[in-house]
Regions:
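Extracytoplasmic ligand-binding site segments that recognize negatively charged/polar headgroups
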Residues: 151-154, 166-182, 215-237, 281-284
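Bacterial Sec-exported substrate-binding components of ABC uptake systems
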Residues: 5-7, 19-91, 190-219, 272, ...
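Positively charged n-region of N-terminal signal peptides that target proteins for export
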Residues: 1-11
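Short helices/loops that flank or line small-molecule/ion binding pockets
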Residues: 80, 132-140, 261-269
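A short, structured surface patch at a secondary-structure boundary
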Residues: 84-138, 142-148
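Alpha-helical, coiled-coil/dimerization segments enriched in small aliphatic residues
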Residues: 111-114, 230-257
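Structured C-terminal subdomain patch of bacterial secreted/periplasmic proteins
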Residues: 177-178, 185, 194, 205, ...
Length: 346
């Protein structure tokens, strides 16, 4: 009987133990039912991840700056191509037109009248009384001016206003080539500059190949008698013109542009006279005025009427049209000499 009681107690204990274990195993099942979906379920509902794309490389802006050295030896740097320019000298203005860069001109010196289209551009006071305020008001990127027309103070004032100043100073034919090259570099017209120079050189080379014979002399009259006689001496492009033609400049012994006297001209007795005096339609022409001067009647050029008036500054403006002036003078001398040979003896 005692044995049966013991078995009953053991059986009850096993049942309690079994019930307790089953309660413990149900709890995790209930918990997993309320948990968030498994990672696999999450990836099924997420948006697909985008593939990372490297940003496109950014190009550095092209460097368009450039530096030139003007005819005074100054280095001038431009940070961009020239869009607005002012030219004070007639030669520089002519060069800009010849280069095909006239659309950049927003101002010119009052004596810049060639080509005729230049007169349509607003003018500013230039020379010894250059009007800096007028120039600044035009807001140019660059100002071209001659050595004789600028001072250190003017340059400083212009550069302070953000205007680059480029100085040209052609005193001979090589200097003209340098001016054309310089302005071509500034305006981005290098090829055009080379073409202009080549064309001029072709004219000069042809004349040099057929020099005038007989050691004839020429007198260049830059300023007429009423204003005081001036001529072109050694170191000027007009003296070079005489030499390339085979002529002798009567005043090759003076330096540069020089004031002379009537007596000196009469004494040197030139075979040819070239005057650059402008004729305004009133009074005697420059040729007639020279022919009528008292005491000049025995000068060979006057007796033979070998006087040429070049009215468009072809020989005084150091630009591309100098070649035209040289050709005109050469043709005049050749034709005059031919006429003299054909003329009957007196």
């Amino acid at each position: 009987m005692k044995t049966k009681k013991t078995l009953a107690i053991l059986l009850a204990a096993l049942l309690l133990l079994s019930f307790g274990c089953s309660k413990k195993t149900e709890t995790p099942v209930a918990q997993t039912a309320t948990e968030a979906p498994a990672p696999a379920a999450q990836t099924a509902t997420e948006a697909p991840s985008a593939t990372a794309v490297a940003p496109a490389p950014t190009e550095e802006p092209a460097d368009v700056s450039f530096t030139v050295t003007d005819m005074t030896g100054r280095e001038i740097t431009f940070d961009k191509p020239v869009e607005r320019a002012v030219a004070l000298s007639a030669a520089d203005c002519e060069i800009i037109f010849a280069l095909g860069a006239e659309e950049t001109l927003v101002g010119r010196g009052e004596y810049c009248k060639y080509p005729l289209e230049a007169t349509e551009i607003p003018s500013v006071q230039s020379g010894y009384e250059t009007n800096i305020e007028q120039i600044i008001a035009l807001q140019p990127d660059v100002l071209f001016m001659a050595t004789m027309a600028q001072t250190k103070e003017q340059v400083e004032q212009l550069e302070k206003a953000g205007i680059r100043v480029v100085v040209s100073d052609a005193q001979n034919i090589e200097g003209i080539y340098t001016s054309i090259t310089l302005i071509g570099d500034v305006m981005g017209k290098q090829a055009e500059a080379k073409a202009i120079i080549a064309k001029m050189q072709a004219v000069f080379d042809e004349i040099k190949a057929h020099p005038i014979q007989g050691e004839k002399t020429v007198y260049f009259e830059i300023s007429p008698l009423q204003w005081g006689l001036w001529t072109a001496g050694a170191g000027t492009f007009m003296n070079e013109v005489a030499e390339m033609m085979g002529l002798k400049n009567c005043f090759a012994d003076v330096q540069g542009w020089a004031e002379i006297s009537e007596e000196q001209v009469i004494e040197r007795n030139p075979d040819f006279i070239v005057t650059t005096t402008m004729y305004f339609g009133e009074g005697p022409t420059p040729e007639a005025e020279i022919m009528s001067r008292a005491g000049w009647e025995n000068v060979t050029a006057v007796k033979e009427k070998n006087i040429l008036n070049l009215t468009n500054d072809e020989l005084t403006r150091p630009g591309p049209s100098l070649a035209e002036g040289v050709q005109m003078l050469y043709d005049f001398v050749v034709e005059s000499l031919a006429a003299m040979e054909l003329a009957p003896a007196a």
